[in-house]
Amino acid sequence: PDRIAHHIRPFWHAGKQVNVHVTDDLGVDAVLDAVAELLDEKPRFDHRTVLHHFGISTQAQSRRAAALGCAVQVNGYYLRYFGDQFVADGLGTERASLMTRAGSARRNGMSVALHSDLPMGPLQPMLGASILATRMSGTGVVLAPEERLSSYDALAAVTIEAAWQLKLDHEIGSLASGKLADLTVLDADPFEVDAAAWPDIAILATVLGG
């Protein structure tokens, strides 16, 4: 952990964006310590450092990450496919519920996006967004309901927030004058449908580079 800043330093000082995979609270501390050290060396006010997975974290870490200007990119499939197993055989209910704390991240002002980690999870954005909005395990247990995202934030996690983290929000991620008309036409309004049913919404058309 004490070498993370060493490895990131040349990219940081060159003005590059940093993306780090981190899955537990010890790892989160190590990455945040490195970001704090590098910010002291070379302040950067739009560095958009992204913590991928953000698996197990604390409220204090979420607040600190936000204060340091970090973003998180989470994988809700851990909740769906491994949540029950983590509760029963590994972490227990309390600690397993700390996985993928997207709700806290948003409340603390961080950008939250979603990835599938293919082949760990499928390339199904509506399913991924649904899991972040419901936090339902495979057996239907809701893990830490306070960490659910709103419908808006869950859908933003696969659109504008993902674009922002890629530094492509000036081109894609939302419909606006001067941006590409990338869009998907659905057969139902996800804001009028329960988030648990989002995976069942049919895709009628997709426009790319419009």
Language model: regions and residue ranges:
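His/Asp/Glu-enriched, well-ordered alpha-helical/loop segment
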Residues: 9-19, 26-49, 53-54, 59-63, ...
